[in-house]
């Protein structure tokens, strides 16, 4: 039987532990007998990320951007236990977060629909796809373990070095923790356009959810930019 040819390469991102083993078996048994596999290979296993100071992850992100498609196995985002287990020089960042930030992409989680797999909710006849913004927020958050009494503040200094805002986050009376997140208007607009374009391409309604009644600046910005994008792209 003649194998299917791949005229254009894709980025192949190998992973950690059992996903590395399973991906090898999938290729050996289900792909290579039928396809002339044409890939650019990147080993995103934790030992190789340590050896390359995580440069391999950045190279993989560039390859996906250049080739327009990549297949990635699951990877370990190390915690303190993994750092000790693997002898890591530092707690390397999540490869997924690094790749998403480099691509300024959107994560779509869509179900695989086949007749042999019955849905848990049998009355649902159409798929539900979850879209998640892939930039900023928790993945780019700055955190601090508060050792004791003190005041946490949110300060913004403009490009001229002028302090334009100072707000008290919390007056700590004892140990605690504080976290700061951010996002950018251009990235949120890109996310909105991506969601609307995806919905149109697959014929699915787009539902937006936020907590703008509580988060009157952060979530409200998402809501307003989504509204603006929808109004701008809607047919007259």
Show which residues each predicted segment covers:
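N-terminal glycine-rich phosphate/adenylate-binding segment common to multiple enzyme folds
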Residues: 49-155
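Short glycine-rich or small-residue beta-strand-to-loop segments that form or flank ligand, phosphate
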Residues: 7-16, 72-74, 177-182, 205-214
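Active-site pocket-lining segments that scaffold enzyme catalytic pockets across diverse folds
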Residues: 182-231
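Flexible, glycine/proline-enriched loop segments at strand-loop-helix junctions
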Residues: 85-86, 131, 141-142, 153-154, ...
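N-terminal alpha-helical transmembrane segments of multi-pass membrane transport
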Residues: 4, 18, 22, 28-53, ...
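Gly-rich Lys/Arg/Thr-decorated short loops/hinges at beta-loop-alpha junctions or inter-strand turns
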Residues: 5, 146-180
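Generic secondary-structure signature for well-ordered alpha-helical cores
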Residues: 28-32, 36, 66-69, 101-108, ...
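Conserved small/polar residues in nucleotide/adenosyl-binding loops
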Residues: 232-236
